[in-house]
């Protein structure tokens, strides 16, 4: 009897509260092999917190995360070697060169830098980093360090890639090159999850775009989906979804008979989610 293959990445009913405030509420995602999915949201929507939970950096209050059917809470090191990630600011050792930082990341993922040398060179050319490979990281701009972090996340050919606003600080040429690198990942069956604010760019790289608002996924947008209100205009679809969610929340507060303090608290909650 053959069963259905598990999702490459599955997030099931995740709840997180920080300082007593709910940050993620019943977050659920399922990504297949070869899929690129994006999460978009306003500042404070919970995007980075979601990625930290997915990568095991933050333990949820409820729910679980599965990589290829295995709970990350009990996954062995080999499972994590198949994951590449870049969350928040790119880390680098200031005294090491860009190349040495990339090699250090490759070793941390259990790969051999000599075997990935061609991949590093190819990715460096795609992101216009070649001329800075031998420069100490302390002398690199934030955008150039972002390129170093991206190559460090991708060079060992991971099965699952998780990236937080990966195009931040990248020049237009590098953005195009990065897009091609993500297509390589999904082309060989890898799975990609990214967050971002650049709507046009997300429609170019993602098969689906989840709208995260106040810790919940309130809509899933499929770029170029026929007949969808807003069509391919992701920005319009995004703000329509956010406005509808806020109006529904306000209506719920009013129908419950709660006083003005409850509405004030609801409005504050929109801006205080980490």
Q: Could you tell me what each predicted segment is?
A:
Residues 40-42:
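The feature captures the beta-strand-to-loop junction immediately N-terminal to the Walker
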Residues 55:
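Helix-to-loop junction immediately C-terminal to a conserved catalytic motif
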Residues 161-165:
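Catalytic Walker B motif of ABC-type/P-loop ATPase nucleotide-binding domains
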Residues 63-74, 79:
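Conserved ABC transporter NBD signature motif
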Residues 103, 107, 115-132:
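Conserved ABC ATPase "signature" region
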């Amino acid at each position: 009897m053959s069963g259905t293959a598990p999702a490459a990445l599955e997030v099931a009913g995740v709840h997180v509260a920080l300082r007593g405030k709910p940050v993620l509420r019943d977050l659920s995602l399922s990504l297949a092999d070869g899929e690129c999915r994006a999460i978009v949201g306003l500042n404070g929507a919970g995007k980075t917190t979601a990625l930290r939970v997915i990568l095991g950096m933050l333990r949820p209050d409820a729910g679980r995360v599965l990589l290829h059917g295995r709970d990350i809470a009990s996954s062995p090191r080999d499972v994590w070697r198949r994951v590449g990630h870049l969350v928040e600011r790119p880390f680098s050792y200031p005294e090491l060169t860009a190349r040495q930082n990339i090699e250090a990341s490759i070793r941390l993922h259990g790969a051999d830098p000599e075997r990935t040398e061609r991949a590093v060179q190819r990715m460096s050319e795609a992101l216009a980093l070649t001329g800075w490979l031998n420069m100490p990281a302390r002398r690199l701009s934030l955008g150039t360090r972002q390129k170093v972090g991206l190559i460090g996340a991708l060079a060992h050919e991971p099965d699952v890639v998780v990236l937080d606003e990966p195009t931040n600080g990248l020049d237009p040429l590098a953005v195009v090159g990065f897009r091609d690198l993500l297509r390589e990942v999904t082309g060989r069956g890898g799975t990609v999850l990214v967050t971002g604010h650049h709507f046009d760019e997300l429609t170019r790289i993602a098969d689906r775009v989840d709208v995260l608002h106040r810790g919940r996924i309130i809509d899933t947008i499929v770029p170029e989906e026929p007949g969808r209100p807003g069509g391919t205009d992701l920005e319009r679809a995004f703000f329509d979804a956010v406005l509808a969610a806020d109006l529904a929340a306000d209506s719920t507060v009013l129908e419950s008979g709660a006083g003005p303090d409850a509405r004030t608290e609801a409005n504050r909650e929109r801006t205080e989610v980490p």
